[in-house]
Amino acid sequence: MGRNGEKQPIILMRKYHFLAAALLCISLQGYAQKPTKGGGISQEMLAQIERNGIQPNDRVISNALAMNKIDDLAMNFKNQHTLDTHFSVETPSQSIHDQKSSGRCWLFSGLNVLRANFARQHKDSIRVEYSQVYLSFYDQLEKANLMLQGVIDCADKPIDDQRVQFFFKNPISDGGTFCGAADLAEKYGVVPMEAMPEPYSAENTSRMAALISSKLREFGLELRKMVAAKKSTRDIQARKTEMLGTVYHMLTVSLGTPVKEFTYTFRDKYGKAVGKPRKFTPKSFYDETVGHPLNGTFVMVMNDPRRPYWKTYEVEYDRHTYDGHNWKYLNLPMEEIAQLAITSLKDSTKMYSSYDVGKQLDRKRGYLAMDNYDYGMLYDTTFPMDKADRISTFDSGSTHAMTLTAVDLDDNGQPVKWKVENSWGPSYGQAGCLIMTNDWFNNFMFRLVVDKKYCSDRVVKAAQQKPLMVMPEDPLFQEDK
């Protein structure tokens, strides 16, 4: 209707509608492309963003998510078939341990490899269970010394220097790598689980670690002041030793005093005693059950598609002991890593390996596959990043170490699926193990420790190159926990 109550011509009304729609379109384009001051969200931007809120078709999913877990709704039901648990190449099974609420997967996996090697040497007639807390104790003491000595070494730098901040931000943790397990076992020996069982604070480390970290930060500031005051090296080292005495006291109260001597009887896999009880020290037990130095016998390989393959890299300060070995690795394509693993498994040798285990993990079945969950369908989007992009953006990286124990090969000798011994207890997953498809293995497997005798001459030679140093802040160089 017109202003005076008269009907407007239909053609004029259509012209008005067309003009209004055109102006609205121009207006929307204008504020959609208009830059905001300082990159913030303006009211116009917010109005545009809010158009992506819940649509009528989303109501069912939104209501379901209000009362259910995301993974339960994103689960691919077609993937809930009965798992094929047959493996064409499999090493002998061994007992599954539980790291509980601690970040010691690297130590559990490392000791799993050592005890499997011992059983293999004795044709599975004798077995041993190593104490994890024994090496955990010295791991924490050594890391405390690494932090304090690192602070001394960098005391001439300002407090906001990147390396200084590295030490104060990460004074101590219970994560690590196989290199740390090797250094600690060689230096302090090993003991059986019966000689030093797990106390509460070994299985629940967060509070103990927080308190020791706080003390180390306090000590670090004191050492910086001593260096600034031109105190002698002798005085500084003497004070550092006193500080480590305090840390040692905190560790003994929490974890118990490390055993120095013990009596032990070896047993077979059925628990029957083999031989008479014998006295051991941690070092003599290492000689008896490991029998040789670990460093120099293995190659750590890694898949990092961001960097050139067949090059060796070393991570600065990524070690457990100040006088130990930095984490050094050879970067290889996944096809090469898979062949190294297959060769080892065919000779009944288990391996330390690490993964981004939280990705696409079916926790109920202990199954890892790329299509376990369809999050894209649930949220009407896609997640297209490849492995290199995920690493570069901190979306993925090595987070958890497990013991590679089996592979299933097709008729052409190509891997179809893999199995690992986990450290989340025997009731988790497949009797304490996880099964993963080869596609998932290629996407989320990162580190593998291989005995040199299973490596080609090319791999051994490449691993001996002078390594390129990389910083511990790199997205990929997280500790296995």
Regions found by a protein language model. Name each.
Residues 1-35:
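Bacterial Sec-dependent N-terminal signal peptides
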Residues 35-95:
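N-terminal regions that are enriched for targeting/export leaders
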Residues 132-262:
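Papain-like cysteine protease catalytic cores
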Residues 34-36, 230-481:
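Active-site signature of cysteine proteases
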Residues 107, 134-137, 183, 192-195, ...:
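Structural recognition of the beta-strand scaffold that forms the well-ordered cores
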Residues 81-154:
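Post-signal peptide N-terminal segment of secreted/secretory-pathway proteins
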Residues 91-103, 166-172, 323-331, 340-341, ...:
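Second-shell loop/turn segments in exported
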